[in-house]
């Protein structure tokens, strides 16, 4: 605004301010949530006042790239306190027009003959003597400066063709506007000015230099504007929890919430990952892989509260009723009606099966994560919306009911949480996967942890570990055979290192969602509509590209890739060894940043789908992140500080982590006249003892020479896992004349990791560790035979293992 009359600018400025604020409140409703709304309000246009010609030119030069428009008087001084120049305003307009032919100008004057100059420079004219000057000013500013709705006009008659209220409407109408009208607006920068006034600076700045002079093709312009808007909306949607609005949720939306309560543990974790991927550009660097989270809508905890109260469910829920009774009551209850339309909108956008996951307040909390206590249901996508709605609401009620099932109540007690503090949010998410006939499943699912307590070879504890499987992730949670590897050493995989192990210890079955089961009999088992299939079925579906290898029984060899005949072995060889898909690299990034931003070790669930075409591309979806907190895993003590006279066993090369203090027994192989030729008999004897421990529900420490579980009886005692399954710590002790390289328990590796068993290697005669056999020999034996001795103590022997430093000790009883 250029004006030197105090009376005039005292009336113009408040008038403009009122107008601008009202506008910015209107367009801030487009923002996705409260945070973005505030940012939008702050991005409103600013009003600057100049009182002289020099000041005006100075301001124009400084801000000329961001000016929405200029309002000027005609008579005002050239310099401060100078003489008034009768045509200063006209000269200003001429100077500005030279620089920018399109910026809107408004001339206001009390001398009506200046109207002629106004038309010469394409400016609007306002008569200061008019009674309705304020109203005129508002109208002209609104029409010319890009405020209000965007109106497409016919350039010849200036009548309205179309009206656009927000970005989504503009995106939808772009290709429908007639070419001449479109041309009229882009050649005058109207689109970018409208975006500026609505505080959408990135798009506006991108579009401003693209004028008719620089690109003379209407359709190319439409395309550029469309793509810019789509990119902007995607950028704005990623890493943000938007408020769910029916008219705004479309395929560019990523994460929205219904309700105002908490998102719960998993919901927060998802929002956290989404934000993390957005802030680290490295995730964008893969040509054939996209990293994302599935489309998600969260029903916040206040929906749960409302559901429980309006249906009077607390009484049944908190009683000691059977689980299925509770479930029946919940299924009869009604969800709030306003959700129906929201769900329909969601179905239209997602068009794939949905997973309904629990996200409770206490789940994945930093100190006592609750994992796997509540139910997760999956439902197929149906064309019949109402049928799908019925399944969805049943699933939501099923998840709500599972808060009050027996197991959850017991778990609550065990972790000293109060059940009425537990509230449940529900996550609705597209299921990651491809459809194969009546089945639906991803190419791979997995769980990655940023700590590895069983590092073998040159792996390091902090490099983390990944368990990978074909099909839905429930297979992993249920303890199926998965492929385990370190993301930094994807070429070294123990399970596929020897053919015999590869055939025995790789995945043979997988889970898929049954698309035919419409869930009429909703049950407490959330896996009721999953199929457990043999890997052969996936081969028929053509889902094993890049994932399987083929066993050739004639040459006794496993070949990477799919070949006719021969059993298919799930090795993920092409992905891990030949890097067809950058899975290992993505996992390195995810674990690195996840741990960095949570400031503690994390566990991440993910799934990936490979495209059906042969172009080797795929999408990697992050499903969940939770901090790793195990009471076992809080070991802060320095084990090297404990003196040798207090320990029974000490190993400087141990696997496993944690503290155990409920072991009272040690079984050890006597070393006095030991000879490897008796190993087979020793194995049978251990099996008998182990059975007694299993029957009594007790555990023990097992010590013996050489490699446990070796199939070569000269290298060690040939036990199988079931024969020693009650042992919590297994020790390989070398003898002077019988020294064996540590096998690190490779024969039972899967079992060691899943049961958290410690594995020590000690060569005491070489000063590598401590093994106080004299102390054991001095104790009375419960059972003694030619080769074995079993000692029981009144007080427990405490086991402490530090997985990061590979140290382990067993203390003397009572220490």
Language-model segment annotations:
Residues 15, 19, 120, 135-146:
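Receiver (REC) domain switch/output surface
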Residues 67-68, 123, 700:
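Conserved acidic residues
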């Amino acid at each position: 605004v250029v004006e030197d009359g105090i009376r005039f600018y005292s009336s113009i400025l408040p008038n403009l301010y009122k107008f601008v604020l009202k506008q910015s409140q209107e367009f801030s409703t487009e923002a996705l949530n409260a945070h973005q709304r505030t940012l939008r309000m702050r991005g409103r246009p600013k009003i600057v006042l100049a009182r002289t010609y020099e000041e005006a030119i100075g301001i124009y030069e400084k801000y000329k790239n961001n000016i929405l428009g200029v309002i000027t008087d005609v008579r005002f001084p050239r310099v401060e306190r100078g003489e008034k120049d009768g045509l200063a305003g006209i000269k200003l307009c001429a100077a500005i027009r030279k620089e920018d032919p399109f910026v809107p100008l408004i001339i206001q004057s009390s001398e009506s003959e200046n109207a002629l100059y106004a038309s010469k420079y394409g400016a609007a004219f306002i008569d200061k003597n008019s009674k309705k000057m304020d109203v005129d000013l508002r109208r002209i500013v609104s029409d010319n400066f890009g405020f209000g709705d965007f109106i497409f006009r016919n350039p010849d008659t200036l009548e309205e063709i179309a009206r656009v209220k927000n970005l989504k409407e503009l995106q939808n109408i772009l290709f429908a506007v007639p070419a001449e009208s479109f041309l009229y607006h882009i050649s005058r920068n109207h689109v970018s000015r409208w975006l500026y006034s609505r505080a959408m600076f990135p798009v506006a700045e991108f579009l401003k230099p693209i004028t008719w002079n620089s690109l003379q093709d209407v359709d190319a312009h439409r395309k550029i504007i469309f793509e810019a808007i789509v990119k902007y909306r995607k950028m704005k949607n990623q890493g943000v929890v938007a408020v769910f609005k029916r008219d705004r949720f479309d395929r560019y939306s990523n994460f929205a919430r219904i309700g105002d309560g908490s998102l719960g543990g998993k919901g927060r974790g998802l929002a956290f990952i989404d934000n993390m991927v957005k802030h680290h550009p490295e995730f964008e660097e893969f040509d054939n892989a996209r990293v994302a989270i599935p489309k998600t809508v969260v029903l916040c905890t206040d929906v749960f509260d409302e559901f429980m109260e309006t249906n009077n469910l607390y009484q049944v829920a908190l009683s000691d009723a059977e689980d299925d009774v509770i479930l029946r009551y919940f299924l009869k209850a009604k969800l709030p009606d306003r959700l129906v339309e929201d769900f329909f909108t969601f179905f239209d956008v997602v068009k794939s099966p949905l997973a309904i996951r629990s996200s409770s307040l206490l789940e994945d909390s930093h100190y006592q994560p609750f994992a796997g206590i509540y139910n997760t249901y999956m439902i197929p996508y149906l064309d019949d919306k109402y049928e799908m709605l019925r399944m969805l609401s049943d699933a939501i009620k099923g998840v709500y009911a599972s808060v009050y099932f027996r197991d959850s109540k017991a778990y609550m007690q065990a972790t000293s949480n109060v059940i009425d503090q537990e509230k449940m949010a529900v996550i609705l998410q597209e299921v990651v996967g491809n459809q194969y006939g009546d089945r639906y499943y991803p190419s791979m699912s997995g769980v990655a942890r940023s700590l590895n307590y069983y590092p073998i070879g040159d792996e390091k504890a902090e490099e983390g570990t990944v368990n990978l499987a074909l099909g839905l992730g429930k297979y992993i949670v249920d303890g199926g055979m998965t492929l385990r590897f370190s993301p930094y050493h994807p070429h070294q995989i123990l399970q596929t290192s020897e053919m015999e192990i590869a055939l025995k210890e790789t995945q043979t079955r997988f889970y898929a969602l049954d698309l035919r089961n419409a869930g009429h009999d909703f049950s407490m088992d959330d896996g009721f509509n999953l199929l457990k299939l043999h890997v052969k079925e996936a081969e028929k579906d053509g889902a094993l590209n890049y994932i399987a290898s083929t066993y050739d029984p004639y040459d006794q060899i496993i070949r990477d890739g799919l070949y006719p005949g021969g059993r298919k072995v799930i090795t993920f060889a092409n992905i891990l060894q030949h890097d067809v898909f950058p899975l290992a690299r993505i996992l390195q990034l995810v674990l690195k940043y996840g741990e960095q931003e949570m400031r503690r070790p994390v566990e991440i669930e993910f799934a990936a789908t490979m495209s059906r075409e042969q172009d080797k591309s795929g999408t990697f979806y992050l499903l969940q992140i939770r901090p790793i907190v195990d009471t076992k895993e809080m070991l802060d003590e320095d084990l090297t500080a404990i003196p040798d006279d207090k320990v029974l066993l000490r190993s400087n090369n141990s696997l496993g982590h944690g503290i155990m203090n409920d072991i009272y027994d040690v079984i050890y192989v006597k070393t006095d006249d030991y000879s490897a030729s008796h190993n087979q008999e020793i194995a049978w004897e251990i099996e008998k003892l182990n059975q007694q421990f299993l029957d009594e529900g007790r555990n023990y420490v097992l010590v013996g020479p050489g490699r446990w579980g070796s199939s070569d009886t000269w290298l060690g005692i040939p036990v199988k896992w079931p024969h020693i399954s009650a042992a919590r710590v297994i020790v390989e002790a070398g003898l002077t004349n019988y020294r064996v390289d540590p096998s690190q328990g490779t024969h039972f590796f899967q079992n060691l990791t899943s049961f958290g068993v410690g594995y020590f290697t000690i060569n005491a005669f070489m000063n590598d560790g401590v093994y106080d056999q004299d102390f054991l020999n001095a104790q009375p034996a419960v059972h003694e035979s030619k080769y074995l001795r079993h000692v029981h103590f009144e007080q427990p022997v405490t086991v402490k293992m530090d997985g990061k430093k590979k140290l382990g000790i067993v203390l003397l009883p009572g220490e």
